[in-house]
Amino acid sequence: MTAPIWLTAADTALIGDRLCALGWLAPDEALTDVASAGDGNLNLVLRVFAIGRSAILKQARPWVEKYPTIAAPVERSAVEASFYQLVRAAPALRTFMPQLLGVDPAWHLLLMEDLGEQADAAALYHRASTDAAARTQLIAFLAGLHALDLPLAALPDNRAMLELNHAHIFTLPFAGADSDLAATAARLGQRYLLGAGPLLHGDFFPGAWVYGDDGVKVIDPEFCLFGPPEFDLGVMAAHLIVSGDPPEAPDHLGAAYQSAGGGAVDSALIRRFAGIELWRRLFGVAPLPVVLDHRRKDALIALAAGLIRA
């Protein structure tokens, strides 16, 4: 097994050689171009082109792509690959995600189906929430995902990634919060760290939703974990609020989830996780991709605190 080389978009020849060595390119086939495939937060994400086809190449490097000073375990690539394989095995879910075409454990590479040049759903932040059809599809995806009956061994060990996420969601953003709020966040963080419950996407926000010709797709399950379904729902609800939904979005989302066949959920816990997501996007290292004036930011801070204490 060769040691990994940490790639960049400029490494066309090296990437071509690696894809040929893996059998992902035919011997008489060559790459014609390599380009960035968007602003990846966690991983290097490239679009690779050969004659008549393209694919997405992801590499987990030993740091967070957007924040290179933050170390991150490269084993997350194997965990993400397992998530895609589990979803692919579920007929009701496989159409929601791009197909995993190849896995290179030595260089921590994933080769993915290219969904095309569609943008993610970040435009939602600049208009009034999701359209009804997309929202229905996203809720159906979560209900189906959480219904999978899987043993914990279905995913490779993800403890290091879980602890990194925990720090940046439940601990570091609350360094300047009042003690009661920080203590509540810490208790919720312990629920997250337990690793008990159904399989979760782990970062179910507009950056992971891609609109295509055949409906909305879900990508980037890099933070997947076993945990409370209310966590996925709370993250989704927080971003729906930012994109125009009322503060009652967590309750509405929980009801819609159960109507879609999802299991029973705790509405208060959805509210608390929604508050956590809002707070960490306001005070953590991964801010919302919107410009907030002081009035709007103060309103979201107050709402987040109220939801966490709900």
Spans of model-derived segments:
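Active-site catalytic-loop/activation-segment of kinase and kinase-like phosphoryl-transfer enzymes
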Residues: 1-11, 147-191, 283
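Active-site activation/catalytic loop segments of kinase-like enzymes and analogous catalytic loops
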Residues: 82, 230-262, 274-293
